[in-house]
Amino acid sequence: MAPLRGWAARGHRLTAKVPHGRWKTMTFLAALRHDRIDAPWFIEGPIDGESFRTYVEKVLLPTLRPGDIVVLDNLGSHRGKAVRHLIRSAGAKLFFLPKYSPDLNPIEQVFAKLKHLIRKAAARTVDAVCAAIGKALPAFTPEECANYLANSGYRS
């Protein structure tokens, strides 16, 4: 990923190296709590039902506590019966967002900041992107996480 903007001295053209050609699809999944980013997971490739079920089973489920609420958008891989069963078996509740409502999904604000930080790091390879994500996650303070939830209309 490359920065979207830059600056140069007046009268001089801005030059920067940016990737072009074929790119690889990378997926980052995480949970947002009122005080931290939880259950981060990075995979090479797009998300599908099987990989999302693996994420829920191996990464998210161990962090869930009874009474937690899992907010999901309407991506097809989120609606699988196995996923719903796994989340409910941990004592957590499921809440599916209405279609086309990213403003109600607080993790979207996290992803926007995360993308900005990755672009700023100018990570060009899969390993560099993964390392940039690892360095960026501590930048999310407890106050900021609580603000993302409040901004989307959730109270904790």
Where are the model-predicted features located?
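Short functional hotspots at interaction and active-site rims
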Residues: 1-156
